[in-house]
Amino acid sequence: MARIAGVDIPNDKRVVVSLTYVYGIGLPTSKKILAAAGVSEDVRVKDLTPDQEDAIRREVDAIKVEGDLRREVNLNIKRLMEIGSYRGIRHRRGLPVRGQNTKNNARTRKGKAVAIAGKKK
């Protein structure tokens, strides 16, 4: 397994798909990285030469991925909560942030339904 940005990427898959195992790299970004590195999308990871691996690593190092990206996202959310914006309040309360309806759904964000005690007579 090749190791890129601290992530073991699978040997048997095509490089364009294997790069998506790194947090922050999707298919479009993966294609751009390979084009900039001059590597074909169809080649398998196990067939990469050491020079090609180094070229891919250099391109990935130029992008914010993995821990740095996670840290930036968490800091952005924390900043929203500190300034008291609407989005920050929704994050703090554990409710949907992007305007979704919460009357019936939003169970993933709100957690398991809790019965109201003393509702029955």
Curated annotation (Swiss-Prot):
GO molecular function: rRNA binding; structural constituent of ribosome; tRNA binding
Segments of this protein annotated with the region Disordered: 96-121
Cellular component aspect of the GO annotation: cytosol; small ribosomal subunit
Pfam families (UniProt xref): Ribosomal_S13 (PF00416)
Disulfides per UniProt: none
The entry's keywords: Ribonucleoprotein, Ribosomal protein, RNA-binding, rRNA-binding, tRNA-binding
Subunit field text: Part of the 30S ribosomal subunit. Forms a loose heterodimer with protein S19. Forms two bridges to the 50S subunit in the 70S ribosome.
Function: Located at the top of the head of the 30S subunit, it contacts several helices of the 16S rRNA. In the 70S ribosome it contacts the 23S rRNA (bridge B1a) and protein L5 of the 50S subunit (bridge B1b), connecting the 2 subunits; these bridges are implicated in subunit movement. Contacts the tRNAs in the A and P-sites.
Name the record gives this protein: Small ribosomal subunit protein uS13
Species, as recorded: Streptococcus gordonii (strain Challis / ATCC 35105 / BCRC 15272 / CH1 / DL1 / V288)
Gene designation: rpsM
